[in-house]
Protein backbone atom coordinates (compact mmCIF):
# COMPACT_ATOMS: atom_id res chain seq x y z
CA UNK A 1 0.00 0.00 0.00
CA UNK A 2 1.22 3.47 -0.83
CA UNK A 3 0.01 5.13 2.37
CA UNK A 4 -1.61 4.28 5.68
CA UNK A 5 -5.37 3.82 5.39
CA UNK A 6 -7.80 4.36 8.24
CA UNK A 7 -6.52 2.80 11.42
CA UNK A 8 -6.53 -0.95 10.84
CA UNK A 9 -6.88 -1.13 7.08
CA UNK A 10 -3.37 -2.56 7.16
CA UNK A 11 -4.71 -5.58 9.03
CA UNK A 12 -6.15 -7.02 5.88
CA UNK A 13 -3.42 -5.67 3.64
CA UNK A 14 -2.34 -9.27 3.11
CA UNK A 15 -4.75 -9.03 0.24
CA UNK A 16 -2.65 -6.27 -1.27
CA UNK A 17 0.79 -7.62 -0.46
CA UNK A 18 3.04 -10.25 -2.04
CA UNK A 19 2.82 -13.76 -0.64
CA UNK A 20 5.40 -14.35 2.07
CA UNK A 21 6.86 -17.61 3.29
CA UNK A 22 4.44 -17.81 6.18
CA UNK A 23 1.52 -17.16 3.85
CA UNK A 24 1.68 -20.68 2.49
CA UNK A 25 -1.20 -21.68 4.78
CA UNK A 26 -3.99 -22.91 2.47
CA UNK A 27 -7.13 -21.03 3.44
CA UNK A 28 -9.19 -22.90 0.86
CA UNK A 29 -8.40 -26.22 2.56
CA UNK A 30 -9.50 -24.81 5.89
CA UNK A 31 -12.74 -23.66 4.31
CA UNK A 32 -13.49 -27.10 2.95
CA UNK A 33 -12.24 -29.05 5.94
CA UNK A 34 -13.75 -27.01 8.73
CA UNK A 35 -16.80 -25.31 7.39
CA UNK A 36 -18.17 -27.69 4.78
CA UNK A 37 -21.28 -26.25 3.20
CA UNK A 38 -22.46 -23.81 5.85
CA UNK A 39 -20.88 -21.77 8.61
CA UNK A 40 -23.33 -19.00 9.35
CA UNK A 41 -23.05 -17.40 12.75
CA UNK A 42 -26.18 -17.21 14.84
CA UNK A 43 -25.07 -14.29 16.97
CA UNK A 44 -27.53 -11.42 17.22
CA UNK A 45 -25.89 -8.13 18.04
CA UNK A 46 -26.79 -6.86 21.51
CA UNK A 47 -29.13 -9.79 22.08
CA UNK A 48 -31.09 -10.12 25.31
CA UNK A 49 -28.69 -12.67 26.81
CA UNK A 50 -25.19 -11.63 27.78
CA UNK A 51 -23.00 -11.59 24.68
CA UNK A 52 -19.59 -10.17 23.80
CA UNK A 53 -21.48 -7.15 22.45
CA UNK A 54 -23.35 -6.48 25.69
CA UNK A 55 -20.10 -6.83 27.60
CA UNK A 56 -18.45 -4.28 25.31
CA UNK A 57 -21.41 -1.94 25.78
CA UNK A 58 -21.35 -2.32 29.56
CA UNK A 59 -17.66 -1.41 29.66
CA UNK A 60 -17.78 1.33 27.02
CA UNK A 61 -15.49 4.24 27.93
CA UNK A 62 -16.32 7.92 27.79
CA UNK A 63 -14.94 9.28 24.54
CA UNK A 64 -12.80 11.77 26.45
CA UNK A 65 -10.89 8.79 27.89
CA UNK A 66 -9.63 8.12 24.38
CA UNK A 67 -8.38 11.61 23.63
CA UNK A 68 -4.62 11.84 23.26
CA UNK A 69 -1.83 9.98 21.49
CA UNK A 70 -1.51 6.21 21.33
CA UNK A 71 1.28 3.89 20.21
CA UNK A 72 0.59 0.79 18.09
CA UNK A 73 1.08 -2.42 20.08
CA UNK A 74 -0.33 -5.42 18.21
CA UNK A 75 -2.84 -6.71 15.66
CA UNK A 76 -4.99 -9.81 15.33
CA UNK A 77 -8.34 -11.14 14.14
CA UNK A 78 -11.19 -11.91 16.55
CA UNK A 79 -14.67 -13.37 16.38
CA UNK A 80 -17.50 -12.15 18.60
CA UNK A 81 -19.94 -14.66 17.17
CA UNK A 82 -21.06 -18.12 18.20
CA UNK A 83 -19.33 -20.13 15.47
CA UNK A 84 -16.81 -22.35 17.33
CA UNK A 85 -14.78 -22.92 14.19
CA UNK A 86 -14.18 -19.23 13.56
CA UNK A 87 -11.44 -18.97 16.18
CA UNK A 88 -9.66 -21.97 14.66
CA UNK A 89 -9.46 -20.35 11.25
CA UNK A 90 -8.66 -16.87 12.53
CA UNK A 91 -5.81 -18.22 14.65
CA UNK A 92 -4.22 -19.44 11.42
CA UNK A 93 -4.66 -16.03 9.81
CA UNK A 94 -3.04 -14.06 12.63
CA UNK A 95 0.59 -15.05 11.86
CA UNK A 96 0.05 -14.27 8.19
CA UNK A 97 -1.18 -10.78 9.01
CA UNK A 98 1.69 -10.19 11.42
CA UNK A 99 4.18 -11.25 8.76
CA UNK A 100 2.64 -8.90 6.21
CA UNK A 101 2.66 -6.03 8.70
CA UNK A 102 6.31 -6.79 9.47
CA UNK A 103 7.14 -6.63 5.76
CA UNK A 104 5.38 -3.26 5.64
CA UNK A 105 7.53 -2.05 8.53
CA UNK A 106 4.64 -2.05 11.01
CA UNK A 107 5.82 -3.24 14.41
CA UNK A 108 5.19 -2.43 18.05
CA UNK A 109 5.79 1.27 18.61
CA UNK A 110 6.24 2.09 14.91
CA UNK A 111 2.89 3.81 14.41
CA UNK A 112 1.00 6.48 16.30
CA UNK A 113 -2.69 7.25 16.66
CA UNK A 114 -4.01 10.63 17.80
CA UNK A 115 -7.66 10.93 18.80
CA UNK A 116 -9.47 14.23 19.23
CA UNK A 117 -13.14 15.20 19.32
CA UNK A 118 -14.73 13.71 16.20
CA UNK A 119 -11.45 13.31 14.34
CA UNK A 120 -8.05 11.70 14.45
CA UNK A 121 -4.76 11.03 12.73
CA UNK A 122 -2.70 7.89 12.28
CA UNK A 123 0.87 7.99 11.06
CA UNK A 124 3.98 5.91 10.56
CA UNK A 125 7.18 7.64 9.57
CA UNK A 126 6.36 10.21 6.89
CA UNK A 127 3.04 8.59 5.95
CA UNK A 128 -0.14 9.78 7.63
CA UNK A 129 -3.91 9.66 7.25
CA UNK A 130 -6.64 11.85 8.73
CA UNK A 131 -10.01 10.39 9.61
CA UNK A 132 -13.31 11.34 11.21
CA UNK A 133 -15.41 9.24 13.54
CA UNK A 134 -18.71 8.97 15.37
CA UNK A 135 -18.98 7.14 18.67
CA UNK A 136 -22.10 5.62 20.25
CA UNK A 137 -21.17 4.92 23.85
CA UNK A 138 -24.32 2.94 24.64
CA UNK A 139 -23.04 0.24 22.29
CA UNK A 140 -19.29 1.00 22.37
CA UNK A 141 -19.75 1.37 18.62
CA UNK A 142 -17.54 3.49 16.40
CA UNK A 143 -17.76 4.43 12.72
CA UNK A 144 -14.61 5.69 11.02
CA UNK A 145 -14.58 7.58 7.73
CA UNK A 146 -11.83 9.00 5.57
CA UNK A 147 -10.88 9.93 2.01
CA UNK A 148 -8.03 8.05 0.33
CA UNK A 149 -7.06 8.40 -3.32
CA UNK A 150 -10.03 10.77 -3.72
CA UNK A 151 -12.40 8.00 -2.59
CA UNK A 152 -14.53 8.09 0.54
CA UNK A 153 -14.77 4.98 2.70
CA UNK A 154 -16.21 4.18 6.11
CA UNK A 155 -15.77 1.22 8.44
CA UNK A 156 -17.69 0.42 11.62
CA UNK A 157 -16.65 -1.48 14.70
CA UNK A 158 -16.27 -1.38 18.46
CA UNK A 159 -14.01 0.01 21.15
CA UNK A 160 -12.66 -1.94 24.10
CA UNK A 161 -10.75 0.06 26.71
CA UNK A 162 -8.65 -1.20 29.59
CA UNK A 163 -6.19 1.48 30.68
CA UNK A 164 -3.56 2.01 29.40
CA UNK A 165 -4.64 0.12 26.26
CA UNK A 166 -7.47 0.53 23.79
CA UNK A 167 -8.55 -2.10 21.26
CA UNK A 168 -10.09 -0.88 18.03
CA UNK A 169 -12.19 -3.64 16.48
CA UNK A 170 -13.24 -3.10 12.86
CA UNK A 171 -15.57 -5.21 10.75
CA UNK A 172 -13.46 -7.33 8.37
CA UNK A 173 -16.10 -7.42 5.63
CA UNK A 174 -16.24 -3.63 5.63
CA UNK A 175 -12.45 -3.43 5.56
CA UNK A 176 -12.34 -5.66 2.49
CA UNK A 177 -14.96 -3.48 0.82
CA UNK A 178 -12.87 -0.41 1.66
CA UNK A 179 -9.76 -1.96 0.11
CA UNK A 180 -11.66 -2.74 -3.09
CA UNK A 181 -12.96 0.81 -3.23
CA UNK A 182 -9.60 2.45 -2.66
CA UNK A 183 -7.47 0.00 -4.61
CA UNK A 184 -9.59 -1.46 -7.47
CA UNK A 185 -6.51 -3.20 -8.85
CA UNK A 186 -6.88 -5.70 -5.99
CA UNK A 187 -10.46 -6.70 -6.91
CA UNK A 188 -9.33 -10.13 -8.10
CA UNK A 189 -6.27 -10.57 -5.91
CA UNK A 190 -6.08 -14.22 -4.83
CA UNK A 191 -5.43 -13.45 -1.17
CA UNK A 192 -8.27 -10.95 -0.97
CA UNK A 193 -10.67 -13.38 -2.63
CA UNK A 194 -9.69 -16.11 -0.16
CA UNK A 195 -10.16 -13.90 2.88
CA UNK A 196 -13.46 -12.63 1.53
CA UNK A 197 -14.60 -16.22 0.96
CA UNK A 198 -13.53 -17.13 4.47
CA UNK A 199 -15.69 -14.51 6.15
CA UNK A 200 -18.60 -14.45 3.69
CA UNK A 201 -20.81 -16.75 5.77
CA UNK A 202 -19.35 -15.68 9.12
CA UNK A 203 -20.71 -12.67 10.92
CA UNK A 204 -19.01 -10.93 13.83
CA UNK A 205 -15.42 -11.17 12.56
CA UNK A 206 -13.20 -8.21 13.39
CA UNK A 207 -9.70 -6.94 12.78
CA UNK A 208 -8.33 -5.84 16.14
CA UNK A 209 -5.61 -3.27 16.66
CA UNK A 210 -4.30 -2.61 20.15
CA UNK A 211 -2.82 0.78 21.03
CA UNK A 212 -1.11 1.91 24.26
CA UNK A 213 -1.58 5.41 25.69
CA UNK A 214 1.52 7.58 25.66
Where are these regions (language model features)?
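Residues embedded in well-ordered secondary-structure elements
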Residues: 12, 59, 102, 122-124, ...
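Contiguous, well-ordered beta-strand patches that form the walls/edges
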Residues: 75-80, 101-184, 212-213
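Amphipathic/hydrophobic helical signal segments and adjacent flexible N-terminal regions
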Residues: 2-4, 20-93, 189-214
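Bacterial N-terminal signal peptides
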Residues: 8-16
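Short alpha-helical segments and helix-capping/turn motifs at coil-helix boundaries
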Residues: 7-9, 152-153
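N-terminal post-signal-peptidase region of extra-cytosolic proteins
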Residues: 52-57, 97-108
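Residue-level detector of intrinsically disordered/flexible regions characterized by low predicted structural confidence
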Residues: 4-5, 116
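Short Pro/Gly-enriched beta-strand edge/turn motifs at strand-loop
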Residues: 92-97, 115
